[in-house]
Regions:
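Aromatic sugar-binding surface patches on proteins
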Residues: 5, 11-26, 108-110
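Short, exposed coil/turn segments at beta-strand boundaries within extracellular/luminal domains
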Residues: 43-52, 127-134
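Extracytoplasmic soluble-region selector
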Residues: 58-145
């Protein structure tokens, strides 16, 4: 029940009445008293005591969260326990920082059972007031796992996660049933096809270029890109869909696409830190300055943009995922 007790720092004290300092506490609860954390605890023999801790004092002796694993599939449950070995059964409280990813099904002072709801990352904390420890939990995305398994040539690739996202969002497809070809140069046809998908595959009514034949994967996308002014062709008649896209061409086409979507493209970065900025074609100067300002395109180093170099499929996936995220943030 409730009792009168004196609080001093330095460890557990039995509940008792003291003439100099009185606090009325309920057993099984935690309190902040001045700069002390006061915890009501029950020892293994069932005796109720109070422990007072200095602010910032290590709580490792009283809280140690453990579970069989930390990576879950959606729908899977897991029990997290306080496994700290000491003479006191601390009644800790549990919290979850992302209820969209995890839910706490049940908990008591010693353990907590969670269920994975959706892919993502979350952490479960257990402790007393501000004195808590956390256990990070990852909920796997089965679709991302499937994509990663389907394209072994992106395993351990620096752009692996962005490539998976680009495929998952329907922007990119593989170059074969089991190949993505991340280091292959992106072609003009591939770029406009990806942007066409990003735009929701709108229909095109105008004529295309003479070298864009019917029935190719890029046919409708190129017609749409020409009709909207996204691309102008190498000549008015020829597009060269299988030619590689340079980094400055990529910036220019993405810039036009953003304008087509009604985005503000006025943000311009100072490119003087890049020693090869002078090699940018005139048409690509503002687009590249915008893309760098918004963090969509970064230099291949701190001093090099390499505007004339071909963009790889991996680089394109990264840039387009950044754009996808940026566009969503503009609408927020």
């Amino acid at each position: 029940g409730n009792g009168m007790l004196a609080v001093t720092a330095g460890g557990p004290l039995p509940i008792h009445q003291d003439s100099s300092s009185f606090y009325n506490f309920g057993v099984g609860r935690n309190y902040i008293v001045g700069d002390k954390l006061v915890v009501i605890a029950t020892d293994r023999a069932g005796n109720t005591s109070v422990a007072a801790f200095e602010q910032g004092e290590a709580m490792g002796n009283y809280v140690n969260l453990a579970a069989e694993k930390t990576i879950l599939d959606p729908g899977e449950t897991l029990t997290i326990r306080n496994t700290a070995e000491n003479q006191y059964d601390m009644q800790i409280e549990w919290t979850n920082n992302n209820p969209e990813i995890l839910e706490i099904l049940e908990s008591d002072g010693y353990s907590c059972t969670i269920r994975a709801l959706a892919p993502g990352a979350a952490s479960v904390s257990g402790g007393f007031g501000p004195y808590a420890k956390s256990l990070d939990i990852t909920v796997r995305d089965p679709e991302r796992e499937r994509i990663a398994g389907q394209y072994p040539d992106i395993a351990n690739h620096w752009a692996r996660e962005e490539i998976i996202t680009a495929i998952q969002e329907g922007l990119f497809r593989g170059t074969g049933a089991n190949t993505f070809s991340p280091e292959t140069a992106l072609t003009q046809g591939q770029l406009v096809t990806v942007l066409h998908r990003l735009a929701g595959t709108p229909e095109a009514t105008g004529s295309s270029f003479q070298d864009v034949v019917e029935g190719r994967y890029y046919t409708e996308a190129v017609a749409w890109a020409k009709e909207t002014g996204l691309v102008k062709g190498v000549t008015p008649e020829r597009f060269y869909p299988n030619s590689p896209v340079t980094r400055e061409q990529f910036a220019a086409i993405l810039y036009r696409y953003a304008q087509l979507q009604g985005q503000d493209v006025s943000n311009q970065a100072d490119l003087s830190a890049y020693l090869d900025a002078g090699k940018l074609s005139h048409y690509a100067q503002s687009p590249m300055a915008w893309a760098v300002a918004e963090g969509l395109i970064r230099g291949v180093s701190e001093t090099a943009l390499c505007p004339k170099a071909s963009a790889t499929r991996a680089q394109a996936a990264v840039i387009l995922v950044r754009y996808f995220t940026w566009e969503a943030s503009q609408a927020a």
